[in-house]
Amino acid sequence: VALDLTEEWKNLAGVEPVQGCIVVRKDYFEQNKTAVRLFLKEYNAAVDYTNANQAETAELMAKYEIIPSAAIAEKAIDKCNIVCYRDDAMRTAAEAMLQVLYDANPKSVGGAMPGDDFYYNDANK
């Protein structure tokens, strides 16, 4: 590996990079709290399963044609750093990423860093 982007980001921001997120409108959440919380629980379980059962996950990825080969998928899973941040850990990681973007160009995050209402913390509910 010529350059480990995860390590480089950790050196820059102090946390691992955020490469994806789940976004829910506040009005949708207010009307569907149970469903959203269940989705987050199942999503977290899927991440745990993927990391603990990489060969089986790779077979499923090939079966459902997400990746053409289970062998390729299994090699990729190990390098993907698949995680599910929730609550305070999610906010810490997201804020670090957004701060780097903001410092480079405030317009990249809408001109200001998000406030408390941007983040969902199930631990505080």
Q: Predicted regions: what is each one?
A:
Residues V1-M61:
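Pocket-lining segment of extracytoplasmic ligand-binding domains
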Residues E56-K125:
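An extracytoplasmic/periplasmic, membrane-proximal ligand-sensing/linker region
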